[in-house]
């Protein structure tokens, strides 16, 4: 894509630095990936990205698992020599997919995966110059864009600009409300893989433990949605 310019490398014999992500390796090339020129250019590019990024890491869903955060630490960035300017755009917070324009770093990965892999073309570049950002193609609302909610753009976003809507607090509020009956549905993917996140062996991560955990938290009923999940997979 060569949008972020963070992957710059130095090719011996060439005057200009080149992006490694979209240049093919050829026989006989001598490539320097960590030369003084590369380090200076890479640091400046990351600083430019940060100057247009809302880096409230403590409240970001990607904190601790953020490519930009890792790069900033690796390049020893402790201040910004550029004026900070963060763009804001409204978004429907009720939609399952949440986009935070203030955190977008214009890497264009969401555009590429949605267009070339999923074939949907939901995202596109909007505005120009320093106001350039990514938004729904054609200035449409996301609810009118036929988004399949596949989640690929969230997976490929290196920061917290794209994420799933978090309804955790709504769940706790429902459990605390004695007038409500809380019904939990567990998909087969969760049933079979939840133990990995807990560092448990497969034979120890039983369905019964999921049931027990939800009942202890306050759920009234717990069901497996394998049938409806199969239908969803067929539709996708």
What are these regions (language model features)?
Residues 1-34, 38, 164-236:
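Iron-sulfur-associated redox domains of electron-transfer enzymes in respiratory
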Residues 5-149, 155, 162-163, 167-174, ...:
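Fe-S ferredoxin-like electron-transfer domains
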